[in-house]
Every structure is written in structure tokens, then in C-alpha cells.
Amino acid sequence: MQSRLISIAASEGFTFHHAERNESTLTLWLKDGPSKLPGYATHQVGVAGAVLDEDNGKVLVVQDRNKTVNAWKFPGGLSDQGEDIGATAVREVLEETGIHSEFKSLLSIRQQHNHPGAFGKSDLYIICRLKPLSYTINFCHQECLKCEWMDLQELAYCSNTTIITSRVAKLLLYGYNEGFHLVDLTMRTFPAVYSGLFYSLYHKELPETYEGSATLL
């Protein structure tokens, strides 16, 4: 919309719905009662990758340069529009650490409202399990202070980390010792009810006896 038209639309009762880059969308509910138009984005999505080397039990960790507390954490960042969760984890790990990896599963989801870094919106922070495809660290010094392969047991009970990192490290340790089928949410792609579109569904693996032809939902 041309900016000179905004004041005219506002005088007729239109209000801002959302703005993105060079475009603004204003709306006006014409029926009686309050507007039932759905709001715009309510969440931002951050994704981290827990890259575990199953041959030696070491996990890839970083310390962010711009944090007030230099705690060990999994490398990650914000998901781009239209980017799958696993793809975000793989991309962010490569950008921050130089390590190539492969998505294996989703481990956890944290929801936090009124997130300071999300312009007052809610934040979803998702941690994925990744398999390393390379091992030589070449980390980004602009984003990270440190980067190393740390023993998973050490990270799980380390005092110099966050609650969520420690808890997911323990979950990862449980899967490493007892079997990842106990902790993994795997991803499957299905056709959506909308023509030509597909969606990703994350869930625990189903036994073969329960598998059947998919019904569109």
C-alpha cells in the first residue's frame, strides 16, 4: 500500500493488521460485533541442534558472544520463513560451528511468552537431534566465544549451562544409553488438504501394526 493512503484508510476505520518489509496491511471488519479476523504472527521460532557423535558420546556446544552469561548451549538461531525445523538446525549449526550435520529427530519444544527478543510476542525454542557429518570445528568468532566437543555426561550435569540445555542433555543421554526411540519425535511429510501443499508431522514412531493408509487432516 502507498503510505499516503494510510491516513485516508485510518480515517475510515481501518487499523493496522501487520507490516512486513515494504508492505502494510490494514483491515476493517464490516459485520456487526468485534472483528473475527485472525491475528498475524504470534510466535517466532528458534531452533538449536544437539549434534551427538555416537562413536564417543561427545556433543557439540558453543558459548554465545552476545549473552550476559557465558553458558554452554547447543548452537542454533531463528528459523527463516518457509524453512523446515530440521533444515534450520542444520543450517545454524553449520553457520556457527562449521560442522556439517544431518537431521535425525525433534527432542523438545519450549514456549515462552513475552519474550524480550521477540518484540513482545511469544517464542518457540525447538531442539533437534543431529548426526555429525564432519568433525573439524571452524566456529564463527562474531557469534561465538567458544565451541567444542564436550562429553555428553559432563554437559548433562555441568553447572555452567542453562536449565533447558542441561535437561535436554539428560534426555539425550537417556536416549544414547537406552535407545533413541524412547526420546525421538521423528518427522514425516504428508499431503495437506490444500491442493499442492504438504506438511511435516513430528511424532513418536508408530509400530508397523498400527501403520496404515493416511487420512488427510
Swiss-Prot record:
Alphabetized CDD domains for the sequence: NUDIX_ASFGF2_Nudt6
InterPro entries from the UniProt entry: NUDIX_hydrolase-like_dom_sf, Nudix_hydrolase6-like, NUDIX_hydrolase_CS, NUDIX_hydrolase_dom, Pre-Nudix
Enzyme class: hydrolase
Tissue: Detected in liver (at protein level).
Subcellular location: Cytoplasm; Nucleus; Mitochondrion
One Pfam family linked to the record: NUDIX
Record's keyword annotation contains Nucleotide-binding: no
Motif Nudix box per UniProt: ranges: 77-98
One term under GO cellular component: mitochondrion
Recorded superkingdom: Eukaryota
Transmembrane segments: none
Keyword Plastid: no
UniProt keyword annotations, A-Z: Cytoplasm, Hydrolase, Mitochondrion, Nucleus
GO molecular function, one term: NAD binding
EC number of this enzyme: 3.6.1.-
Chain ranges of the Nudix hydrolase domain: 42-177
SUPFAM superfamilies xrefs: Nudix (SSF55811)
Additional remark text: This protein is coded from a FGF2 (BFGF) gene antisense transcript.
Function: May contribute to the regulation of cell proliferation.
Family designation: Belongs to the Nudix hydrolase family.
Protein name stated in the entry: Nucleoside diphosphate-linked moiety X motif 6
